[in-house]
Regions:
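N-terminal catalytic or cofactor-binding beta/alpha core of small enzyme domains
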Residues: 2-129, 138-151, 157, 162-177, ...
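Active-site Tyr-X1-5-Lys
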Residues: 134
């Protein structure tokens, strides 16, 4: 199990998901986060679905993780690893697009390898809601402060089988933890500055 790997290498991991929103009263990401065993070195957070920069920055400051994995619910057909966050948001279809942070790049890459394995696809579009917002805010903060934190984000279909989703998240976490331990997974800021 990936948690044993984390405890063996003193790695600090932050895994986050989101609570209910709109018509979704049961967010699959909250269930997955709650399913992860509690252990030293692993912090689990379920954020409210809000465009609130402070909640994400506070979590980064409080836990100082080596690796952050965000989980978001989607209407897609398969699990997808996000490769970048875009610097725009839109709270609803009736509201105009606007930048998350003015004067910042149009997009920022995550620090995960391009190939997540056969159990997930790659996405270049994290949407325009709070998932993308959290990604951009955290990646920009990691870059601005040149933190040694690796970052990744996974979108999970809302109707995906919960047990299967937990197994896939576990595999992805193990894969990325092994890469980080072997120093093949760079901190996010080194990729942002490449």
């Amino acid at each position: 199990m990936f948690l044993q790997l984390f405890s063996d290498c003193s790695m600090r991991i932050l895994v986050y998901g989101f609570g209910p929103y709109r018509e979704f009263h049961d967010n699959i990401t909250a269930r997955i986060v709650r399913s992860l065993p509690s252990q030293a070195g692993l912090k689990k957070i379920i954020f409210p679905v809000r465009f609130q920069r402070r909640q994400f920055i506070d979590a980064l400051n409080r836990h100082r993780p080596d690796f952050v994995l965000g989980l978001g619910q989607s209407s897609r057909k398969r699990i997808e690893v996000e490769s970048r966050a875009k610097n725009y948001r839109r709270a609803s279809k009736s509201k105009p697009w606007r930048p998350i942070l003015k004067g910042k790049p149009k997009s920022l890459p995550t620090s995960l390898p391009i190939d997540p394995g056969r159990w997930a696809g790659i996405s270049t579009d994290a949407g325009d809601y709070v998932c993308n917002y959290s990604m951009f805010v955290l990646l920009e903060e990691i870059d601005r402060r040149q933190l040694r934190t690796s970052f990744g984000f996974i979108h999970i279909p809302y109707d995906f089988d919960h047990r299967k989703a937990c197994r896939i998240v576990d595999r992805i976490l193990r894969k990325f933890a092994l890469l980080r331990v072997s120093e093949q997974l760079e901190p996010a800021f080194t990729r942002l500055r490449a």
